[in-house]
């Protein structure tokens, strides 16, 4: 991308930065090439022309980011935790930007549509400049494992880093679980302020300036008691110094969110906001009632019978959703993304068979893969095939599930969340799980 930026480099004045060699070669007098891990193989094309090359590690020297950047990483919970913090800070009258899977937002305005969880380095710098121009105090961003490995966050000084959890995902990119864990944990090696899920056994971090939250272990922010029925209520206790039990803050919270895993997201978000603002816990706690969650994350699309859409596309993510409804009769409808980690497919089938009384296997985003082959991979993990229905057409699968759903049952439509497209080998179509459900019940009502 091309970023408007006036700077002098190697005694030459430039008006733009770009990580695209074609853009630079078209106008080398005005555009300075920025070399990153993603485009370094093209750098010789620039060098052959004797043009200047700015290494991505030097980029930060030409920007003055007077804004508190918060980076949130983890297998699950990034989007909800980031959105929760954004909501809390806005309610506290703090001018805040949010960047992540759902797009770029500033002060409740949708600035840019969704793209990568973490954009390219120049896009990120561009978004930061826009947030600063609009006088934001905080910049909340999701940080993917890809972005960490590809150094898409190079040069940023984080005011706070947050870890939600580490399970297994993106093994098509990282090759194995060890590399994936190492990528996540590498984000927390420095001595900066960090918030860590103390119950996460895979977490490795520098203990200097680490603050923790947990349900099961002793941590800086703990839950003394909680209820998940029908939504989250809890008594929280915060200790700034774990060695001094007399210095405590407590607060009662009530949240419209569902499920134990959302209680973890709440703990991460509340602790993050407390550390950033230094406000009392009892000032932050009441604001949780204003946050109703994120579209496509445990989203109730219809209440009776209960139909829920969720982004869960990993074994751990699916289990957390299932746990939220384990006392109900579950129909689970899902597929798996094509051209992605194949090893998780049978595991997804296995976890669904543990919780669901009926499983409907369908397409997700098959991309270049054959839909039937993806479904066969999922079936390998399901012992009882009698509870399985296969319908590769996702719309038909959802409609069939709705037609057979009883009032005391719950339909969990998993994998795509708030996505509004479906990607095939030769086409991309508009598709929304929510719209299919809403249209069905609207037509039913109209007769």
UniProtKB/Swiss-Prot annotation:
Chain positions with N6-carboxylysine modification: 184
Alphabetized GO MF terms: ATP binding; magnesium ion binding; tetrahydrofolylpolyglutamate synthase activity; UDP-N-acetylmuramoylalanyl-D-glutamate-2,6-diaminopimelate ligase activity
Subcellular location, record wording: Cytoplasm
Pathway this chain belongs to: Cell wall biogenesis; peptidoglycan biosynthesis
BP-aspect Gene Ontology terms: cell division; cell wall organization; peptidoglycan biosynthetic process; regulation of cell shape
Domain of life: Bacteria
Residues reported to bind ATP: 74-80
Keyword field: ATP-binding, Cell cycle, Cell division, Cell shape, Cell wall biogenesis/degradation, Cytoplasm, Ligase, Magnesium, Nucleotide-binding, Peptidoglycan synthesis
Reported cofactor(s): Mg(2+)
Motif, Meso-diaminopimelate recognition motif: chain positions: 364-367
Post-translational modifications: Carboxylation is probably crucial for Mg(2+) binding and, consequently, for the gamma-phosphate positioning of ATP.
GO cellular component, as recorded: cytoplasm
Residue numbers binding UDP-N-acetyl-alpha-D-muramoyl-L-alanyl-D-glutamate: 21, 117-118, 144, 150, 152
Pfam families hit by this protein: Mur_ligase_C (PF02875), Mur_ligase_M (PF08245)
Residues annotated to bind meso-2,6-diaminopimelate: 340, 364-367, 415, 419
EC number: 6.3.2.13
HAMAP family attached to this UniProt entry: MurE
Function: Catalyzes the addition of meso-diaminopimelic acid to the nucleotide precursor UDP-N-acetylmuramoyl-L-alanyl-D-glutamate (UMAG) in the biosynthesis of bacterial cell-wall peptidoglycan.
Family of the protein in this entry: Belongs to the MurCDEF family. MurE subfamily.
NCBIfam families per record: murE, PRK00139.1-4
Protein name, UniProt field: UDP-N-acetylmuramoyl-L-alanyl-D-glutamate--2,6-diaminopimelate ligase
Organism: Helicobacter pylori (strain J99 / ATCC 700824)
